[in-house]
Amino acid sequence: MTAPPNASPIGPMKVDIKALIAVFLGVALGALDTSIANTALPAISTDLNASAAASVWIVNAYQLAVVAGLFPLAALGDLVGARRVFLWGIAVFTVASLGCALAPDLLWLSLARGVQGLGAAGVMSVNIALIRILYPAARLGRGVGLNAFIVGSSFTLGPSVASLILSVANWPWLFGISVPLGLLALVFGWSTLPNTVPQAHKVDPITAVLSAVCFGTLIYGVGSAAQLSGWPHIVLPLVVAALSGSWLVVRQRGHAVPM
């Protein structure tokens, strides 16, 4: 996914509507899928013969992948260009959505949700960078505000959208509906999103791993505490988060271009 249109300078005079649809649709799908599965957990767990406690991983896997992937993928966007990360992100998200819709058991669904979350992280990590390019400088605040509105409203509407879908279809359609919409965002993005000039610095792989481990274990530990899980599921992840976070801060302080 590297055949781009000509690169555009930051702050074009006109906003490309198809490019905006690609970016905002991708962001909306990523935010929507953060909460869309919550309403359907009882139906999914019954259909897949899974316990209520185990089915929580349908939500957790997605959220962990998003949180763990945001910073490393944003840094990757600086290295290879925001357009490329966005396109690969929406492609992974769309394929994983199909995998979720076809999942025969809880393990498959949870793994597909994790991959879906990584795709969403790719989209969300570079969307502001793309908005900077697509919007004129004088209207950049409007673009950022619209992006925040779409993220917030999509997350809030997730349970309502899920209830609407479940009233006319079964739970796989919660994820299947993202496939055509993801393809639309991919096609529009492929044809309209401009190249960005990659930064000269290199991505530090150790920093990327530390960031993913720190935030992933932090969210896991806090989630386990909220679910009143056993102490090993709470204390150990939080200790790992604290240690990896401390190492991350120390390493970033000496880095020429911190993440």
Question: What does each model-found stretch correspond to?
Answer:
Residues 167-259:
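Hydrophobic transmembrane-helix bundles of small-molecule transporters
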Residues 2-191:
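Transmembrane-helix bundle of Major Facilitator Superfamily
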